[in-house]
Amino acid sequence: MVIDKSIPKATAKRLSLYYRIFKRFYADQVEKASSKQIADAMGIDSATVRRDFSYFGELGRRGFGYDVTKLMNFFADLLNDHSTTHVILVGCGNIGRALLHYRFHDRNKMQIVMGFDTDDNPMVGTKTPDDIPIYGISTIKEHLDNSGIETAILTVPSIYAQEVADQLIEAGIRGILSFAPLHLQVPKGVIVQSVDLTSELQTLLYFMNQNHLD
């Protein structure tokens, strides 16, 4: 199957949602799903579904729908969800602690295996109820050496985000999910996905206000 390398970011952001939908269809014993069924489950239009899928070659036949098992496995491969991905978390504040307690592995094959914070944080040297060890940030390279871990969640205050990101990259991290509301400068080959909760909330309020005006 030929995959178009120039997939738009909007399409890429929907990949995990498609995967989730096909897993739900599979659990409900749905064998075939039309683009309309997929679109309705996603809250988008069927033309968007067909356009998204066109970037991945022939995923289904017009008039026959999409094979649920085939597409579920396709997106699992695409998202590397057949094997567990180990992730570290840096920043054990309120957001960090919430994420440490979130059971990613119950829903997808992702698992936080280590947490890091400033060396003087009382959590350093302890473990979470799920047995995740918390280490001092000064030992991050030591703990990542030969670990094979390339993904990190960054939940430190904004003023430290770039400095910590630099440390992560030096330690071998290639992908960062950042909760800091600023643009991180990273070298080519390192991917940053940003989550700005304030911006998302402001966007929600904007649309609520526009809906009220209508």
From Swiss-Prot:
Residues 17-56 bind DNA. GO terms for cellular component: cytoplasm. Its main location: cytoplasm. Keywords: Cytoplasm, DNA-binding, NAD, Repressor, Transcription, Transcription regulation. GO terms for biological process: negative regulation of DNA-templated transcription; response to redox state. NAD(+) binds at residues 91-96. InterPro entries: CoA-bd, NAD(P)-bd_dom_sf, Rex_DNA-bd_C_dom, Tscrpt_rep_Rex, WH-like_DNA-bd_sf, WH_DNA-bd_sf. It is found in: Cytoplasm. GO terms for molecular function: DNA binding; DNA-binding transcription factor activity. The keyword Methyltransferase does not apply. It comes from the Bacteria. Modulates transcription in response to changes in cellular NADH/NAD(+) redox state. PANTHER family: REDOX-SENSING TRANSCRIPTIONAL REPRESSOR REX (PTHR35786), REDOX-SENSING TRANSCRIPTIONAL REPRESSOR REX 1 (PTHR35786:SF1). Belongs to the transcriptional regulatory Rex family. Homodimer. This is Redox-sensing transcriptional repressor Rex. It comes from Streptococcus equi subsp. equi (strain 4047). The lineage of its organism: Bacteria, Bacillati, Bacillota, Bacilli, Lactobacillales.
